[in-house]
Amino acid sequence: MGEMPIYKRALLRLGRILTCNKGVYCKKGIKNHVAGGTILYEPCTIGSYNYFAPYTLAYNAIIGNYCSIGPGCRLGLADHDIHAISTRAMINNGAEEMELFDYEHPTVIGSDVWLGANVVVKQGVTIGDGAVIGANAVVTRDIPPYAIAVGIPAKVKSYRFEEGSIKKLLESGWFDCAPEEAKAKVRMLHLEEKKV
């Protein structure tokens, strides 16, 4: 454990236990709700206006804005080399510490993503903006924006909106705005959809 660099104007609503290793960063002006039992390992970068339910673990992850992370989610879990003599990396690598993480390929959770309870996202995977991942899914491959994916391994079952609407949502960039501006942009998008 170590210090978590947070800007002076950052606001985190914390549960009883939040463990952060050094190298965990939050954006300036951050406002997140982080429930108890959450552990963030370095390096992690967290956007604004996210909700982390209890007992979330994140390793080497980049998380966008306005995400809802369900209870018991595991982000950025590493693989063990099952073809090596030992499954323990420190034995195979001759290192004193476990070297399982691919720091050059973080796990990326876009903005406005909803991860249901107990979702596992493997290291190096990208989940696109607006995607929804069903409870207990194991995400082993990239998931496109606004997709709905479920299962083990997670597979895209449908999309939240039609292709044209997804394009408009992504272009609007509403999830990069503060809440009041984001709400206004979303209202405008709703009005445009009703006209069609």
Label every PLM stretch briefly.
Residues 1-40:
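Extended, small-residue-rich solenoid/repeat segments and analogous flexible loops
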Residues 79-81, 143, 159-161:
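Conserved catalytic-core motifs of eukaryotic protein kinase domains, centered on the activation segment
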Residues 83, 141, 145-147, 155:
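Glycine-centered loop/turn positions within well-structured domains
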Residues 133, 151:
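Conserved G/P- and acidic residue-centered "switch" motifs that form tight phosphate/ATP-binding loops
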Residues 14-17, 23, 88-121, 153-196:
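C-terminal segments of enzyme domains that contribute to small-molecule binding surfaces
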Residues 112, 130, 147:
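Catalytic-loop signature of eukaryotic-like protein kinases
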Residues 15, 33-36, 40-47, 51-123, ...:
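Flexible, glycine/small-residue-enriched loop-and-beta-strand segment within the central core
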Residues 118-131, 137-141:
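Beta-rich strand-turn-strand
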